[in-house]
Amino acid sequence: MSYLGIDLGTSGLRALLVSDDGQVLGSVERSYNSEHKHSGWSEQNPSHWVAALDEAALELRERYPEFADLKAISVAGHMHGATLLDENSDVIRPCILWNDSRAHIEARQLDETKGVRELSGNIVFPGFTAPKLLWVKNNEPENFARVAKVLLPAAYLNYHLTGDYVADMSDSAGTSWLSVSARDWSEDLLRAGDMRADQMPRLVEGCQPAGTLRADLAARWGIAEQVIVAGGAGDNAAAACGIGALNEGDGFLSLGTSGVLLAARDGCYPAPASALHTFCHAVPDRWYQMGVMLSATDSLNWLAQVTEKTAAELTGALGHTLQPPGRVLFLPYLSGERTPHNDAAIRGSFTGLGKDTAQNDLTRAVLEGVAFGLRDSLETFSQSGTKIERLIAIGGGANSTYWLKLIATVLNVSLERPQDGDFGAALGAARLARIAHTGLHPERVLLKPDIVETIEPHAELLAAFNESYEIFKEAYPKVRDIQMPSGS
């Protein structure tokens, strides 16, 4: 027996095949492009997702004989995208993606609507789904009038696989149409966004069966028996499943292009005023909260570009011993900031530069600035009652031991480095497929990876970094006043 996890990413699709005991058999990848017709626009043609999935499945069939005994499939997808279908289930226009910011006016108006934050549990960001539909209504009324169904990217692949309109709660929580606490579509939120319940897909939990694979696809892929399609998940919930972040206090730190701090919750405790995301998890009776900073390794890669070095060269030059906070302060807002400021206009800055400032000082400042930005997210977690004592560190930035020592100390949280292997969204999706087929309890399947190293905070530097963090916090409003003196 085997299970297939699909990670429908922004730049490509990854298909991961696992055995009946959860061991990775192999994976294949396919890439596709986004279109950016105007500044702030980001779109994709859903037919490219379908083609990528079909090519990946056919390659898996050729490479792995276990694929013929496939029992279940699950899709994890990039969240918030608006795929619009007409009454014939034809795609009306390209999907508007999560990183499309055209609906900023509609997002602000919707966010200011009474009850929206309370019901949805979140600020309405421009990248969320509901403001995109209001933008279509205001700017493409002929397309809005044709909308029969709105599907998120993962739900669109669910439709392709099963012929049914079905989505899971973790993905749907990022639409601003779902009551995150009730785990169901909200009539009030739909009404606020000029949408109807019949335009929404049926909801299931991510680890529950959503349907079965279409017979024609099964025949094309060389599968003789019935295949279950699980509800699936949004990409971050799937990543949490892949790394075993299921119960209260479980969490991970992702040091990628952006920085993500995610913690599982056993209840729904929204804190929208802090720009902290509160979403349904992919398993019943679980939620998760997530703080996002927009420029984590992006900040280091920017410095590497302007100094004509590699990121590894910059961090390697610092050595292995964690140093006290430097005099140079960096605000890592190269593309604005999400948590806790929800400020798309703010930009980064250095302060404290002198004639004696050297390259290593800039590197330390960038690493410290990112660590302080993550501390901002951690502070919002504390305000909502989330207790985090340790985090699993993943992503490209986690390869820097110096950076992990720094972050552990700034956060005063132990960081665990996992053994090399697969524990991302594709694995999480495959695990959800396995649960949907076997009925196993999620805790028996959503296991944590083996930990090869635990990095503890440097107790002797806690006070110094706490003091530096307070300066970092005070810098944001002052720099914003300089950059936007009119308060715009």
Question: Model-derived features: where do they sit?
Answer:
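N-terminal glycine/serine-rich phosphate-binding loop of ATP-dependent small-molecule kinases
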Residues: 1-94, 118, 146, 218-219, ...
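Active-site core segments that coordinate phosphate-bearing ligands/cofactors
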Residues: 4-5, 104, 108-123, 134-166, ...
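Generic detector of well-ordered alpha-helical packing
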Residues: 8, 46, 87, 101, ...
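Short, basic and Ser/Thr-rich N-terminal targeting/leader segments
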Residues: 9-12, 69, 76-78, 129, ...
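Structural signal for short hydrophobic segments within the conserved structured cores
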Residues: 26-30, 201, 453
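Short beta-strand-loop/turn "lid" adjacent to the catalytic site in phosphate-handling enzymes
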Residues: 61-98, 122-127, 154, 158-179, ...
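Short loop/turn motifs at secondary-structure junctions
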Residues: 66-69, 196-199, 387
